[in-house]
Amino acid sequence: GDIVQDVNIPIELDANDGFEDRTGYIVIKNQGDVVEVSDTLYVTQRLYSQIVYVKAGANGDGSSWERAFGTIEEGLSACAHYGDMQMWVAAGDYYLKDWIEFKKVNFYGGFEGKETTVSERTMKRKSILHAASSNVWPSVYMYKLTEGATRVVDGFEFVDSKGKKGEGALVAYEYWMIRNCVVRNNTCARDAGGAYFLCTLINCVIRDNETLSTSSTINVQQSTCLYNVTVVNNRSAGSSAGVR
């Protein structure tokens, strides 16, 4: 009968940075002087997307709303530091598995899941990032950017952090711009219960956070800029339940 043999063929493809999907093929043939084609494999390479899509409950490759990733972690894994990429996250609840680092790209939340531009968002709901219950550190880290390389985080809620170390739900360093976001229902045993900021905040709400130590609820460092930021109903075991 026919002889069946598994054949492993390593393939390397350059990123498809064109404007449409592209298709190629691989011809499998025998070795030797007599050429005998035994099979042809066709390969379709999807267009390289500058936008990574995330939608709770989805199970795709992140290349469109219809093929979105289902978790924040999957979306982050597809982003590269300082790339010209954006991560678009549909409104809904996302339960983190551990603390995460926001790659140095732009992050937009609050989508319905059909928009083609950021300006189409109605922002009726935000993308809510729930802290992992086992995580004792801040849920989200936004590390210092290269000077002049501002990145935006827009349309998210950071909630349910129960930190024992570090500062509250998130830590954001220089040159990040946080817009239209909410930090709520977080506690920390050691430092700021809400967040540590060394960045710019615009149209944000920081509420219902608690610090169990003598620290403030929000730790704001020297170059932080606050524009239309509401700080309300926060609690501290020390003398400052607001901003330090």
Model-predicted segments: where are they?
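Surface-exposed binding patches on compact interaction domains or structured appendages
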Residues: G1-E12
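A short beta-strand micro-motif common to beta-rich folds, especially ectodomain repeats
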Residues: I9-I11, E20-G32
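Acidic Gly/Asp/Thr-rich repetitive segments characteristic of extracellular carbohydrate-active
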Residues: A56-V89
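Short, T/G/N/S-enriched strand-turn elements that build extracellular solenoid repeat scaffolds
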Residues: I72-H81, Y94-F102, Y141-K144
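N-terminal extracellular ligand-recognition/capping segment immediately after the signal peptide
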Residues: G83-N106, G110-T117
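Right-handed parallel beta-helix/beta-spiral solenoid domain characteristic of secreted/periplasmic
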Residues: V105-K165
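Extracellular beta-strand/beta-solenoid scaffold signature
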Residues: K126-K144, K162-V171, T187-G194, E210-Q221, ...
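Right-handed parallel beta-helix
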Residues: G148-D160, Y175-T187, L198-E210, Q221-R235, ...
